[in-house]
């Protein structure tokens, strides 16, 4: 092999290592939170809980990457996104940021309800909170006490250190 090809392959390997390592994932998470004007600590906690900063994480249900984005959710948030791009950590985080930002706006800037929707699904949450007047500052996690996974999820993100 020629030196130029080896050098190029080596640089590509370094780039892949930099992009896909957990330290870079943490830094990307902080940057995306700032860019999308999200609560940095809560968005950081969300990604930590979802994937433990593993860029190549995939759930049993098919959620992909750092933000554990379902392909159908990605298409809903960014209609023309090729699903394969969810494997790119930055694209995945941007999609997660846009989705949680959408949910926060939908649920009157209430993080606990937005997090429940991120975890359990919008439709499920909409049915659960039907006719509820949402207060921005109120913690609604107890509404989800009968949904142990979502209740625990909200607690982990809102109270993580």
Q: What feature does the model see in each segment?
A:
Residues 1-14:
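N-terminal Sec-pathway targeting helices
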Residues 19-161:
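Catalytic glycan-binding domains that act on GlcNAc-containing polysaccharides
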């Amino acid at each position: 092999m020629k030196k130029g090809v080896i050098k190029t392959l080596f640089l590509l390997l370094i780039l892949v290592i930099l992009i896909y390592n957990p330290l870079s994932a943490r830094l990307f998470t902080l940057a995306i939170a700032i860019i999308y004007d999200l609560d940095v600590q809560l968005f950081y906690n969300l990604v930590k809980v979802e994937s433990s900063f593993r860029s190549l994480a995939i759930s049993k249900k098919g959620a992909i990457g750092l933000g554990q984005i379902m392909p159908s959710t990605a298409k809903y948030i960014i209609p023309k996104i090729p699903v394969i791009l969810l494997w790119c950590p930055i694209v995945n985080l941007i999609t997660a940021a846009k989705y949680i930002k959408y949910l926060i706006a939908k649920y009157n800037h209430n993080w606990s309800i937005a997090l429940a929707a991120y975890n359990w699904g919008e439709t499920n949450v909409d049915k659960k909170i039907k006719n509820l007047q949402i207060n921005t500052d109120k913690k609604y996690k107890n509404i989800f006490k009968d949904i142990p996974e979502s209740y625990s999820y909200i607690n982990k993100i809102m109270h993580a250190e």
